[in-house]
Amino acid sequence: MYYNKQAIKATVGHGSVTVKDFSAGINGNKDEENLSLGECAFSYNFNMQGGTLKDGNGVKKSNFGNSPVFSEAGVKPERLYFYKRYNKDAKAYDEYLLIYASDKEIYAAKSTEEQFKKVDGLYFYTPPYACSYNYMGDDVMIFSSDEKMKVYDGTTVTTVENVPSVTSMCIHSERLFATEGGTKTSLWFSDDFNPLNWKVSLDEAGFIDIREGVGSLLKAVSFKDYVYVFANYGIVRVSAYGDQTEFSVDGIAASSGKICADSIAVCGDRVIYLAEDGFYSFSGSSPQRIMRKIDGKIAGVDNSDAKGCYFNGNYYCKLKMQSDCGVRDVLIKYDIHRGTFAVSSELDINDFVVADGEKACELLFLINGKAQPAMLSDRAENFSVPLDKHWLSGKTDLGTTETKRVTRLSLRTLTEIYVTVKSERGSRLLHFFGSNERQSRAVGLKGDLFTVSIDCRTPGATVSALKIEYEY
């Protein structure tokens, strides 16, 4: 008996996945294997808000006055301050930038000047806190640290004697309120209408001892008719109007994680801050968690030196985050109305301040190694030098648990980019050029789980419609 022999062909399945929308952004709370393809394990210097990968924020030369230069040889700028005072003779405001530098001196530049110059007498061993106050009809800048308090009026410096060791301060109801660095449990307040008088008496200055089980006091802020005192592990509300005999501590909100002092910023109708376990928004009652998707990226990272501020509807915070290549210094931009955030990196920020001038309001930065303050740019750049932009997917099985072979990857990009496809069996680097047309590249990589990373250095990034084709 004879049989016809026929070749037995293996059945090959085909499939594809597409990322049409990148706006899901970073999700550090899920294991990478559980991320959807539209989410990413990490990203920086890309703006994903509209669903397309575009340039995020960078910094550029500021337009503050004559863009003054700090040129003191061998001295590094460390802190940045803004000060404005009404010039009665000119009937206009004089505006200044001030820098605390590594030589412990403070340097000032008026907006009409081109160089920072040392201010004689403004010397502090540690970076001071500062706030503006209209004292006896004159706009002055009060500087204070854990060693001394000094007042600068744009020309002269006055040292204030017999003041507490200040670790933060704010103006409330015409008094200066300050947390104290000695016992770290005292909230001091100056005489009303006189922030230079700290003599303790029933009708002058005084202090409130706060021992509520919240740890050391970190920062005092004036918010919604109260002074809120942020401590290591909680927030204390102080009613402080009228006669000091009527001052009272009348509310406490606990924090499960240690609060980072300089991250605290009043943002309109809320205060936003960073604690060890993540970011919080506080509107006067119970703190609420925000930006939960990055909790996993900051867990276990020391952010005791994080700093935050509020500018133009956004909360900005300089901090450290875990990335796919270790711990990174980043700048978070959080839109308080939309609840969205973006991450910038490779800026090397020393400090920043909101310069609330009469003609313009800008967020200004001290960038390490740069002689001039910077301002925000809508391009991913550092003083005209393009920044690397990076997006990394989670680990995906592309919708099937079987071993598969990625055959092609296609997308749209208006600029040059590099795409890396990885599996447990290897990797492929794909090069795409800027074009108005959809582009496709062969991959030829087997595996069970895959990651895709997109890297771009060219300004004006626009990446969309990522499609991965495979067979199994």
Regions found by a protein language model. Name each.
Residues 80, 140-141, 176, 235, ...:
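Conserved structural-core and active-site-/substrate-pathway-adjacent residues in large, well-folded domains
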Residues 68-76, 122-125, 157-306:
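Beta-propeller and closely related beta-pinwheel folds
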Residues 86, 146-147, 182, 233, ...:
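Residue-level signature of beta-propeller blades and closely related beta-rich strand-turn architectures
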Residues 1-117, 124-128, 132-135, 255-259, ...:
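Beta-sheet repeat architectures centered on beta-propellers
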Residues 147-148, 250, 333:
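Short, basic/low-complexity N-terminal boundary segments at the transition from targeting/disordered tails
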Residues 154, 225, 414-416:
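Short glycine/proline-enriched coil/turn segments at helix->beta-strand junctions
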Residues 132-160:
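Hydrophobic or amphipathic alpha-helical targeting/insertion segments
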Residues 103, 145-146, 154, 181, ...:
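Short strand-coil-strand connectors
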